[in-house]
């Protein structure tokens, strides 16, 4: 959603503060514009945030030693391969700032921060257009776009905003092509844990071959968007040093580190979130189709759909924030993205859409 608030253009979803300013802080809000866990922050994480307060008079550990060790154990990689940051967006910008590629490749559509970070360092960005006729799936033509002179390739698995995955054989060929061309593959796996089989879509096992930076975040799976905590996985010592140097010295606060440690213990919560998304995603997709929308068959915790009727303002007046995809390259104003929420929340969205579209729901 691109909105101007106090002369500031907002690129992403989740603008609850703008809604509160417009409609009043106590207005009933359903935010489906941000793809975070519908179960909210785990109780154990909230408790950890409160418990760490007495230690906040000291600087946080700049190396996030305990958290990096815990992440390494959870991911099955050495702790030395882990770099924590102020959300995955922090690490996207660090990658651009650290390497300053002259030319980079992204897909269209894709998460806007890739191109924003690359633009900030004067990089020429090439967009590989994903075809609507193929539901915006990545195809083998992408391999031909990875050629010498391209210094960085951003790929999202699953893609945002489509929610679609790439077949593993093609992912591996993309990585090999990047290595041959001398390009760093930055693979964004922030939504990977919402997939039916996350292990089938991660490239963690390929890290030791070099040329690969994997990005993940606590934001989505644990409902921790306000905490700001993400991490990168990389086997390259020299690259990690550059990424660390490109960031501020205390990028991850004491509360964020405490929250991350607590979140990694919330295995039951993760299972509950995954089960909820698995049950609700097809139900929400069917509801959107019944309203006449074209729905991309996403595999994560959000759905991309097309509707020719303007939806953003009518839904805002009904207390619902929906993500317009009009600012995504390769899409347009008729495309929208919605998070998959709880059953009652999804029902509220579908009922409101039915009112707007005159379907009598």
Where are the regions that the model predicts?
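PLP-dependent enzyme catalytic core of the Aspartate aminotransferase-like
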Residues: 169, 317-318, 327-361
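Short beta-strands and strand-loop turn motifs
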Residues: 31, 127-129, 152-159, 185-189, ...
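Conserved PLP-binding catalytic core of the aspartate aminotransferase-like
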Residues: 277-278, 288-319
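PLP-dependent aminotransferase-like
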Residues: 9, 97-155
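PLP-dependent aminotransferase class I/II
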Residues: 41-42, 63, 211-296
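Short loop-beta-helix segment that forms the pyridoxal 5′-phosphate
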Residues: 60, 72-94
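Active-site pre-lysine segment of PLP-dependent enzymes
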Residues: 119, 136-149, 161-221
């Amino acid at each position: 959603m691109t909105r101007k608030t106090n002369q500031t253009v907002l690129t992403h979803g989740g603008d609850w503060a703008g809604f509160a300013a417009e409609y009043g802080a106590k207005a009933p809000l359903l935010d489906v514009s941000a793809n975070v866990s519908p179960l909210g922050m785990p109780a154990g994480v909230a408790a950890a945030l409160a418990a760490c307060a007495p230690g906040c008079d000291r600087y946080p550990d700049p190396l996030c030693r305990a958290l990096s060790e815990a992440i390494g154990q959870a991911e099955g990689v050495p702790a030395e391969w882990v770099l924590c940051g102020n959300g995955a967006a922090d690490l996207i910008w660090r990658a651009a700032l650290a390497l300053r590629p002259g030319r980079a490749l992204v897909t269209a559509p894709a998460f806007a921060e890739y191109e924003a970070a690359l633009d900030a360092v004067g990089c020429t960005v090439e967009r590989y257009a994903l075809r609507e006729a193929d539901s915006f799936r990545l195809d083998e033509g992408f391999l031909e776009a990875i050629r010498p002179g391209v210094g960085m390739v951003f790929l999202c698995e699953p893609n945002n905003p489509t929610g679609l995955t790439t077949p593993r054989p093609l992912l591996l060929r993309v990585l090999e092509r990047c290595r041959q061309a001398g390009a760093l593959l930055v693979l964004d796996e922030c939504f990977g844990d919402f997939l039916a089989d996350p292990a089938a879509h991660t490239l963690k096992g390929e890290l030791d071959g070099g040329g690969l930076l994997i990005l993940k975040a606590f934001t989505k799976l644990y409902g921790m968007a306000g905490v700001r905590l993400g991490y990168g996985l990389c086997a390259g010592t020299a690259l990690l040093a550059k990424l660390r140097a490109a960031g501020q010295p205390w990028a991850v606060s004491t509360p964020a580190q405490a929250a991350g440690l607590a979140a990694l213990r919330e295995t039951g919560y993760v299972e509950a979130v995954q089960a909820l998304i698995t049950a609700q995603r097809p139900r929400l997709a069917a509801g959107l189709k019944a309203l006449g929308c074209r729905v991309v068959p996403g595999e994560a915790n959000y759905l991309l759909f097309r509707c020719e009727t303007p939806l953003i303002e009518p839904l805002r007046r009904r207390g619902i924030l929906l993500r317009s995809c009009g600012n995504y390259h390769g899409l347009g104003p008729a495309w929208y993205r919605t998070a998959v929420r709880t059953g009652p929340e999804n029902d509220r969205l579908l009922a409101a859409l039915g009112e707007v579209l005159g379907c009598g729901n």
